[in-house]
Amino acid sequence: MQAALEVTARYCSRELDQYGQCVAAKPESWHRDCHHLKMSIARCTSSHPIIRQIRQACAEPFEAFEKCLRLNEAAVGNCAEHMRRFLQCAEQVQPPSSPTTGEAQPLPAS
């Protein structure tokens, strides 16, 4: 879960901040009034390579978790076991190695 939060915070901080502000401002109706912002976080994170890789590798537990959330909107705590299975799978996924990470590469010795 820490990895997912880090990716979300790093690449989707604007969306995450907007959603958090909406939830805080509308404690009675956040699930309805902030849904569009929740979806913007989902769109943002879905475009990140590690998230796409997790969704592919962990499709089955992810779909079960999403289904549980839809069925238990008012009691998401009922989905703890589904979440645990998904996160256990997600933690096993390694980020794709990319030669162009934007970090400086050492020069070859001459």
Swiss-Prot record:
Pfam families: CHCH (PF06747), CX9C (PF16860). Residues 9-52, 55-97 form the CHCH domain. It is found in: Mitochondrion intermembrane space. Keywords: Acetylation, Disulfide bond, Mitochondrion. Disulfide bonds join 12-44, 22-34, 58-89, 68-79. Signal peptide: none annotated. PROSITE patterns: CHCH. It comes from the Eukaryota. Gene3D superfamilies: 1.10.287.2900. The modification N-acetylmethionine is found at residue 1. GO terms for cellular component: mitochondrial intermembrane space. A motif (Cx9C motif 3) lies at residues 58-68. InterPro entries: CHCH, CHCH_domain-containing_protein, CX9C. Its main location: mitochondrion. A motif (Cx9C motif 1) lies at residues 12-22. A motif (Cx9C motif 2) lies at residues 34-44. A motif (Cx9C motif 4) lies at residues 79-89. This is Coiled-coil-helix-coiled-coil-helix domain-containing protein 5. It comes from Mus musculus (Mouse). The gene is Chchd5.
